[in-house]
Curated annotation (Swiss-Prot):
Residues 27-79 form the F-box domain. This is Putative F-box/kelch-repeat protein At3g27910. It comes from Arabidopsis thaliana. Keywords: Kelch repeat, Repeat. PANTHER family: F-BOX DOMAIN-CONTAINING PROTEIN, F-BOX/KELCH-REPEAT PROTEIN SKIP4. CDD domains: F-box_AtAFR-like. SUPFAM superfamilies: F-box domain, Kelch motif. Kelch repeats lie at residues 138-184, 185-235, 237-274, 275-323. InterPro entries: F-box-like_dom_sf (IPR036047), F-box/kelch-repeat_ARATH (IPR050354), F-box_dom (IPR001810), Kelch-typ_b-propeller (IPR015915), Kelch_1 (IPR006652).
Amino acid sequence: MTFVVSVNAANPTPKVKKPTVARSIPSPTSLPLPDEIIVNCFAYIPRCDYPSLSLVSKTFNRLITSIELNIVRSLFQRTENVLYVALRFSHEEDPIWYTLNQKPYKNKSNSCIHKLVPLPSCPSLPCWGSSVIAIGHKIYVFGGCINGDMTSNVFVIDCLHGTFQFLPSMRVPRGCAAFGIVDGKIYVIGGYNKADSLDNWVEVFDLEKQTWESFSGLCNEELSKITLKSVVMNKKIYIMDRGNGIVFDPKKGVWERDFLLDRDWVVGSCVIDNMLYTFGFDSVKRIYRVRVYDPSVRVWSFVKGIEDIPKMDGTLGSRMANHGGKLVILLNLDKNGGTELWCIKIALERRGQQGEIWGKILWYNLVLTLENSSTIVECFDITI
């Protein structure tokens, strides 16, 4: 897929890699059927079968990688969740996008092999510090560091239509800001010294109007300018910095500490059904396991049924993601200066009167091998 750039003239152009211009599908094809009919047929085929189809002919490969196919799938309500992963190989380089695909062959157990495949046409992020949020088929990017300086730029990547557009800038440059979407509005919090501009500590972007709104509420809790993680549960924004766990209720304008959240929350976590999943060490069994936090009762517990997760001895730099309601763990393992990325997919369910969370491993395998070390910058679902 290639991406088309659309620039808002009121904003300066960020120094990001410029994508190539999309090309329309050439016609006619060598097949007896018009391209439009073939694309309509492909729209009803699961994406996991596309790698096999792409090997049939050059025409099939061209149509499967076209933007038109994504659009038709959306019109026919045949969209699927695709895992997007951004990897950075040094602090001076912009991250590179990958997607989790299935290879067109099966292993000895007759199950499909999953691989991370580079997506070079997708516009890159600033080298570090961006606040990135995925909504449907779009990726919104706020601020970050470009050539050593923080930026106030905002842009959106439309993965369905293959477009790239600059949006109105924030009032102040930000890096490593907290963020969260509540009721169609994106709240961007911090990311700079609060004393420099107290009035702009929180900015609100209206997704429908595509405009920024002011926010009058002040943060009465001690929050660092650099946040490590932020998530949304039950329409509240949970923020983790280097020392505190802060809960922000945008509707009430209330900020408060959550000391229980501080204890076990780590960076590589995710939210599924308003529950926070993260990595945790079981001091009794002396192994790393998946922990879950229920904000409604403020209780941590271990996910049952998956005590023996492979490769869980190395969780530093690893990430979790909500992949269509399933828990995906992407393990970033150092191998003699290189990197092995292992992916584990887990189905979750509540059981019993106590509502215990149980998991079942659906599959796990090596999805990418790299000669150099890497950092997982982003890992989330896109609907296309």
